[in-house]
Amino acid sequence: AASDVYKRQSYQFQDTEHAANLFALKELGHIYTRIGNPTTAVLEERLAALEGGAAALALASGQAASAYAIQNLAKVGDNIVSSTDLYGGTWNLFANTLKDQGIETRFVDPADPENFRRATDARTRAYYAETLPNPKLTVFPISEVADIGKEYGVPLIIDNTAAPILSRPFDHGAAIIVYSTTKYLAGHGAAIGGAIIAVS
């Protein structure tokens, strides 16, 4: 069922105490649309339910989702280990933008899950892969790589853009799922968006 669309950028407060509680995060509610609104909240709840996750965060694009997920785990001097089989935009994000921010990406061939182990060190903060990578569509070994990550305390981030109805990465050990909602979730390519979903 379709939900209402809220087009406002700010919200009315009951009184100053209500506003203070919202801004102090003592009370849940909407403050400013960039942070969240009722329409976005419905999307986030539905995406979390689709994947069996605890919560979701809607963002402006799939690239934003990938960047947010990694930048919340890694900082200057850290690294991530990524599958070589990636959408070109994600490859460029990792090889250039993250590098410029001081986060190294170690690209490995996903055909052998042990490549993730071999590339892991004390500064590895995440593993990253696509369920069905664009354009190869080779199935990524989620369970095997997630198990390796658990040995080192390294979460597996899975881009599930190509397979949201076909695959539930949390069921196979992934810790975080990202999407470009522009593709199959939007259904017609008329809206750009992205999302991050956290495991329960």
Regions found by a protein language model. Name each.
Residues A2-Y6:
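Short, small-residue-biased leader/transition segments that mark boundaries at the very start
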Residues K7-F13, E17:
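C-terminal substrate-binding/catalytic lobe of Rossmann-fold NAD(P)-dependent oxidoreductases
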Residues Q12, G52, V199:
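Residue-level marker of positions within ordered structural domains that often coincide
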Residues D15-A67, G89-T97:
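Conserved N-terminal alpha-helix of the aminotransferase class I/II PLP-enzyme fold
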Residues A56-S200:
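Conserved PLP-enzyme active-site core in the AAT-like
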